C-alpha cells in the first residue's frame, strides 16, 4: 500500500477456494484451479488450467491438471447450467466444457511443461512464476492435459460444420462468460469506433450472432488444430477417428472422476450420521439419504 491501494488479483473462470484459503494480491490463477492454503508470493499460474495450487511448508506448490481427476470439477461444470434459471438472458454465457479457450490453454501448458523439464531433466522440482512444480506432478500434468485435448478436439469436431464464413482460428477469449475469438471482439470494437454499431442493442446483437454459430466457430478452430498436429488437412476418415478417440478419452476421464466421487461417498465418510440408529444398516440408510446417494 506504499504506492497506493491498488492490488489486483484475478481468478479465472471456475477457480475454487478451500476453507481458509488466502491469496495475497497481486496474483493470477488459471481457469478451474483449486486453491488450498495461504499464498503470498504473487504467483501466476494462468498457463495451467484445471490445476491444484496448495501450500506446503509455506510455499505455493502447483499440480498441473490435477483438477481434471476431481469429481468436484465435474459437479461444478454440470451444476452451473442447471442452476441458470434466468427468464431473461441478457448475458451470453457459454457453459461448454470442451471449448477452444480452455483447450488452447492446455496446448500451451503442454509446451510450457516440456520446456520447463528440458531445462533440467533430472531436477526433482522446478519453479515457474513463483510456484513450485514437482517433477512427478509435471509429468502427470502432461498426460492429463493431452487426454483432455484429445477429448476436447473430438467433441468440437463432432459439433458444428466446416464453413469458410465461420473462421474460428486464432486466439479465443472468455469475455464475461462468453467464449469468442479475439478477432471478432476486435472487429466489434472497430465497428463501434467507426459508428457502424451505434447502440448497446446493436453491440449486444453482434455478440449474440457469434453465440448462435459458436459450434461452427469451435469446429473450425478444432479442425485447424488437428490439421497442424497431422501436418495436413484431415480427411473425413481422420475426422471420424478423432471424434471416436475423443469419445474414448471422455469416457476414461469420466471413469476417473466417478472413482473420485465413490471414494468421497464411501461409508468411511458416514461418521456422525444416524445418531439415533440402532445398527449399521440404519446409519448407512441415513447417510445415503442425507447425501442423496440412493
Model region roles, listed by residue range:
Residues 6, 10, 23, 54, ...:
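Extended aliphatic helical segments
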Residues 182-294:
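C-terminal amphipathic alpha-helical interaction region
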Residues 83-215, 219:
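Long, charge-rich C-terminal accessory regions
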Residues 12, 28, 53, 62, ...:
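Generic detector of leucine side chains in alpha-helical contexts
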Residues 1-118:
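Glycine-rich hexapeptide-repeat left-handed beta-helix
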Residues 4, 14, 20, 30, ...:
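Residue-identity detector for glycine
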Amino acid at each position: 500500500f506504499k504506492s497506493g491501494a491498488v492490488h489486483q488479483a484475478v481468478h479465472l473462470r471456475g477457480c475454487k477456494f478451500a476453507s481458509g484459503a488466502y491469496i495475497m494480491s497481486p496474483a493470477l490463477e488459471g481457469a478451474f484451479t483449486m486453491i488450498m492454503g495461504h499464498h503470498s508470493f504473487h504467483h501466476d499460474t494462468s498457463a495451467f488450467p484445471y490445476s491444484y495450487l496448495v501450500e506446503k511448508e509455506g510455499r505455493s506448490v502447483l499440480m498441473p491438471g490435477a483438477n481434471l481427476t476431481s469429481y468436484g470439477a465435474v459437479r461444478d461444470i454440470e451444476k452451473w447450467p442447471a442452476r441458470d434459471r434466468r427468464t431473461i438472458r441478457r448475458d451470453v454465457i457459454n457453459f461448454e466444457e470442451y471449448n477452444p479457450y480452455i483447450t488452447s490453454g492446455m496446448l500451451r501448458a503442454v509446451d510450457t511443461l516440456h520446456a520447463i523439464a528440458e531445462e533440467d531433466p533430472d531436477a526433482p522440482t522446478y519453479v515457474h512464476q513463483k510456484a513450485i512444480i514437482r517433477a512427478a506432478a509435471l509429468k502427470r500434468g502432461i498426460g492429463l492435459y493431452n487426454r483432455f485435448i484429445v477429448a476436447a478436439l473430438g467433441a468440437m469436431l463432432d459439433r458444428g460444420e466446416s464453413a469458410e464464413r465461420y473462421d474460428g482460428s486464432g486466439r479465443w477469449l472468455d469475455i464475461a462468460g462468453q467464449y469468442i475469438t479475439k478477432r471478432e471482439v476486435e472487429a466489434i470494437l472497430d465497428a463501434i469506433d467507426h459508428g457502424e454499431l451505434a447502440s448497446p442493442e446493436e453491440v449486444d446483437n453482434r455478440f449474440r450472432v457469434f453465440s448462435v454459430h459458436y459450434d461452427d466457430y469451435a469446429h473450425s478452430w478444432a479442425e485447424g488444430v488437428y490439421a497442424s498436429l497431422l501436418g495436413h488437412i484431415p480427411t473425413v476418415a481422420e475426422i471420424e477417428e478423432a471424434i471416436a478417440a475423443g469419445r474414448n478419452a471422455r469416457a476414461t476421464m469420466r471413469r476417473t472422476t466417478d472413482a473420485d466421487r465413490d471414494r468421497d461417498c464411501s461409508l468411511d465418510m458416514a461418521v456422525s450420521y444416524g445418531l439415533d440408529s440402532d445398527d449399521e444398516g440404519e446409519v448407512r440408510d441415513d447417510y445415503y439419504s442425507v447425501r442423496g446417494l440412493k
